[in-house]
């Protein structure tokens, strides 16, 4: 319940005791609003506890400083025996006095009204357990908190790493936010995210204003732009961005041309080469990962096919759309042929690597090779499945390969690294493509395991904070 400006121990010194803190229960107000509530129970006193509530002052007009309201109270036998209110800072008598109950509850009413309006219109899933909706709503509320002005992207929050400006143009921050807001009916927020990203971070040549462009994410971006048009009919917004959208598609066309210029005997002939993971460019020799990862081609197919369908509606050149469709058909055939040719059926389950020509499984490669071209296979497999361009038998084979060769933990795609006996990682946001394919293939039990494991193992319970 503390912040960098106020501590609940100011009201009750015992709230600093480790034993009491370890017995805390956590949640958020109303099940989803970004107000943190913690209950700490006294050992041996089941009817006694401390209740802490903290939320941001939505009436504050500071540009960067976050003003906060705090309530710390002690309860015995169901009755409040002591309570302390604070607005942002400790008392500094006589100029700054303690907050009053009237001030606190007036601010709380304003806070609730603010967030109900901000999340108004968000789709509510029809589920027996309403807490799944709460979890989703809280995710959108948290996104609005993290994004300065509500639309400027941030990959992380608070701490220097990942909140630094060098991550602001991260393609995944755009695609995951844009996608989620579209699917949950938050079209106004999706439009705000779209405008900000293309105006601030997409250059005239189609590349993002960030290091390490990820090839697959260009394709996903095109697909999501087409989805936005289908869901909203907002062609004028996309027409304004037409030159940059065309440039994005051209980035992929240029990579495709390079792949087609390779010898037909090359493993990567006809498959898009390039970085699949942004971090690749930070290594001494980034060319190790300038490779024909299957995910690059899969999401490119998806992007070309989808954007071509709505290109004439946007006033785009019909010849361009026809060319993208032709390229997608050619690439789809090449992708399937390469995958089938690179299945290792001497292993059980059969193994297919994240790129053609691999001799080792991803686990073996990460253990035996100092730097492995199969690094970050979790992204490569998840994106390959997310694109939904594989025949069902190949999609099943890829999922079985990831599961059977140590690429999942509790049903969730692992953040795959060299294995060690003391730990297993679960992957955060990138893994959603894997889950989507489970659902499309009617692998319902595996999908449910994924969803529950992600909720209860990747996210902290109550406060819904997920690891990367």
Please place each PLM-identified region on the residue numbering.
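Secondary-structure transition/capping motifs at alpha-helix termini
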Residues: 45, 75-76, 185-189, 200-205, ...
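Aromatic-lined carbohydrate-binding/catalytic grooves of carbohydrate-active enzymes
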Residues: 152, 193, 197-219
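Active-site lining segments of carbohydrate-active enzymes
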Residues: 151-172, 207-211, 229-230, 236-290, ...
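Active-site core of glycosidic bond-cleaving carbohydrate-active enzymes
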Residues: 168-203, 239, 243-246, 250, ...
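Beta-strand-rich N-terminal accessory domains
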Residues: 1-18, 28-30
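The feature captures the catalytic groove of carbohydrate-active enzymes
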Residues: 78-104, 209-216, 254-329, 362
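Acidic/polar, glycine-enriched structural segments that form the non-catalytic walls/loops
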Residues: 21, 28-167, 235-237, 249-251, ...
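Hydrophobic/aromatic-rich effector regions of fungal transcription factors
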Residues: 220-231
